[in-house]
Amino acid sequence: MIRLKKCSLIWLTLLLLLIATAVNAAEKNFVEIDIYSVNDFHGHLRAEAADPGIAVLSGVINELMKQNPVGSLLLGGGDMFSGTIDANEYQGLPVVTAMNKMGFSANTAGNHIFDYPLDVIKRQAAAANFPILGANIVEAAGDRVAEPFKPYVMLQRNGLTIGILGLTTVETKGKASQFNLQKVKILPPEQIAQGYVDELRRQGVQIIVLLTHIGSSQGENNGITGEIVPILQKIHGVDAVVTGHSHLCVSGTYGDIPVIQAGCHGEAVGRINLLYSIAAQKVVSANSRVYKLSELPRVQDNAMERFLEPIFKNIDSKYNEILAVNSQVLTNDRNGESRVGDFFMDVLKNGFKADVALYNGGAIRDTLPSGRVTVRDLLKIFPFDST
């Protein structure tokens, strides 16, 4: 009971703070817009280890968006549909359905969307209640945006027209399945972005958000660094930037433009708050924040949990066969040498009687636990069909 009261008090405090801001905005003829974002979810639907699971992620986002229901939107920063057997077994569709239930307004294409062939991506797009954006993903034989991607979407929130322009990293060309990329090409984002920004402004859009799957980070003074910076140097007229790809928690500004990234696997939610002046016809104030779910009261979406139960049950019955017993934990480190990587490279080298075994370290995604090892444990370590 004490914990319940404490959790309720935290949410009430957040609610009162944002209501106060909204009232202040109304009194001064301002409009408040809240942009919430999740990126690099990688199909982590299930709650386990450090992953909160999408039922909790959905519950927390529902609570946050109640604070400004008419002025909030939820965006996906790419790499959402693949990366676990729970998602991959169904070609990403459980994630699409979950995002529909959560009310996502748009999702940008990340490099890992091409873990799937283009015909599967088209089925994902057909199942989604939101557009999959990718202004710089064009047809291999021309310059038209490739189907099923859209360059942008225009949304209405709190009386304002908001343009969401989607961009993906050029690293897709070297990181995605070459077979699945045959019918598309990835243009440098800065080559096409300004033209679309200008097009949106001509259509009367009042706020423009770059929804990107492009890496960002922060330096010593919290300045924005990373792949996104040279792109922003060549674009003007945007009001907010959502990033992804580098799996970091980022909250800062480039110039006076808020830039956000919310880690990975649903561990966090990004929020950009914009205050738009009706009189000045522009954004006059902006701030950003990353909410780590581990630091917020746990709120579960029970309807989401019920939707997932049969999916998890089917996966467990199919992939929980015990293959071996492991005597020690083999840890993983994506940024350096790791015990699990060393072990499996030895397995490859010895199995093929080779002198050297080479593997994409970024595709090794989990630790091998001690105790019984199942097929699902191995698929958590090597989740991508392309590797």
For each of these PLM feature ranges, what is it?
Residues 289-292, 325-330, 358-368:
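A glycine-rich phosphate-binding loop feature that marks nucleotide/adenosyl-phosphate handling sites
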Residues 319-339:
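Glycine-rich phosphate/diphosphate-binding loops and the adjacent beta-loop-alpha structural elements
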